[in-house]
Amino acid sequence: MPPPSRSRINKTRTLGIVGTAIAVLVTSYYIYQKVTSAKEDNGARPPEGDSVKENKKARKSKCIIMSKSIQGLPIKWEEYAADEVVLLVPTSHTDGSMKQAIGDAFRKTKNEHKIIYCDSMDGLWSCVRRLGKFQCILNSRDFTSSGGSDAAVVPEDIGRFVKFVVDSDVEDVLIDTLCN
């Protein structure tokens, strides 16, 4: 077999040199970027612009179960109607005047779709699961059975669907949680 021609050897050698040079340049640039970014911010970068907004939005998303004690809190519901707040109103634990007052507050801001009326506790917890909000705020003492037992009202699996369940009967805690 005859030896390869000199021009073919030169083309192969040139192609190999150019490929190696490109690989070295790309690797050098990558290392340079890693080193300079590590010096500037020590590797801790803030999230990109849109994800910051999403985190703030997720932190404020609340599901409020409107029991009698929460309905009695001195809160201006009009201020929270535009936020990421959904009110779950168990019809058996709510009086008509409060339903009307809350409904009017949300209607003024055209957010009446954020009020969900639930006929049963199973339906209420199903809504909590499907909404998947960041916080669920309630006073479970308002939902104890008529026999007076302190059986837990919050289902065990609810932590898979809601990040934080705030269950308190202290008025200041409820107001602070609702308003922040």
UniProtKB/Swiss-Prot annotation:
Present with 259 molecules/cell in log phase SD medium. GO terms for cellular component: cytoplasm; peroxisomal membrane. One of its GO terms (molecular function) is ubiquitin-protein transferase activator activity. It is found in: Peroxisome membrane. This is Peroxisome assembly protein 22. Its main location: membrane. It is a single-pass membrane protein.
